[in-house]
Amino acid sequence: MTKLIIHLVSDSSVQTVKHAANSALAQFTSIKQKLYHWPMIRNLELLNEVLSKIESKHGIVLYTIADQELRKALTKFCYELKIPCISVIGKIIKEMSVFSGIEIEKEQNYNYKFDKTYFDTLNAIDYAIRHDDGQMINELSESDIILIGPSRTSKTPTSVFLAYNGLKAANIPYVYNCPFPDFIEKNIDQLVVGLVINPNRLIEIREARLNLLQINENKSYTDFNIVQRECIEVRKICNQRNWPVIDVSTRSIEETAALIMRIYYNRKNKYHK
């Protein structure tokens, strides 16, 4: 099997480059992949260390570096090695500059901008943590989104992912034979989304969870009929109230969150900024 080596170089956390690389790699499932992460490369000394690693492990280089001197050094080095060197956002920045008529700033300020978006994100993360798994249900009116679904349908990580995008998300588990809280219907301003999953897949996930915790007594947790009933009931609850339902069986957390955000902003007639 072919192996593809990719070096992710950034003057920040490499998340932007990583997302771009993963999106592209999703189109090449038949090859082995090896990603090398090189974050916080902000001077020539650090860059030279990375260049030596690239020289020993030839592969595609993806980068986001604002400093012009560092960019030139990196691209020149890769050119001499005859390996691809791709700026992930360079084309975007250039087109923005051309379209707006605004010159690209030559100096990069590495001080993080603590603006409203930053603090909104912190507040949303705090909210997601405090309102995880049905906690503090008396504060649901403060949420933007409420997720409901059986246990292990990725409600918690989805809530956190939404929080990183500035949305306050609470999540409430649905448990078989337990009455669903009536108060949730009073929160008419919130988007309520049901998460369901293929019962067989959910049983696999729950069994893995029980094995990890070394628990062998909770048989109802992995009983097919009960698991299937939980998913059916969540669909029923949502359909009766015109709440959207998302099947997460084959979706990543990022995909689920992205779909929820699309529903949220369409519902609120907003655009994500």
UniProtKB/Swiss-Prot annotation:
It comes from the Bacteria. Its EC number is 2.7.11.32, 2.7.4.27. InterPro entries: Kinase-pyrophosphorylase, P-loop_NTPase, PPDK_reg. Keywords: Kinase, Nucleotide-binding, Serine/threonine-protein kinase, Transferase. GO terms for molecular function: ADP binding; ATP binding; phosphotransferase activity, phosphate group as acceptor; protein serine/threonine kinase activity. ADP binds at G149, P150, S151, R152, T153, S154, K155, T156. It holds the Pfam family Kinase-PPPase. Gene3D superfamilies: P-loop containing nucleotide triphosphate hydrolases. The keyword Transferase applies. The keyword Transferase applies. It is an enzyme of class 2 (transferase). It catalyses: N(tele)-phospho-L-histidyl/L-threonyl-[pyruvate, phosphate dikinase] + ADP = N(tele)-phospho-L-histidyl/O-phospho-L-threonyl-[pyruvate, phosphate dikinase] + AMP + H(+); N(tele)-phospho-L-histidyl/O-phospho-L-threonyl-[pyruvate, phosphate dikinase] + phosphate + H(+) = N(tele)-phospho-L-histidyl/L-threonyl-[pyruvate, phosphate dikinase] + diphosphate. Bifunctional serine/threonine kinase and phosphorylase involved in the regulation of the pyruvate, phosphate dikinase (PPDK) by catalyzing its phosphorylation/dephosphorylation. Belongs to the pyruvate, phosphate/water dikinase regulatory protein family. PDRP subfamily. This is Putative pyruvate, phosphate dikinase regulatory protein. It comes from Rickettsia typhi (strain ATCC VR-144 / Wilmington).
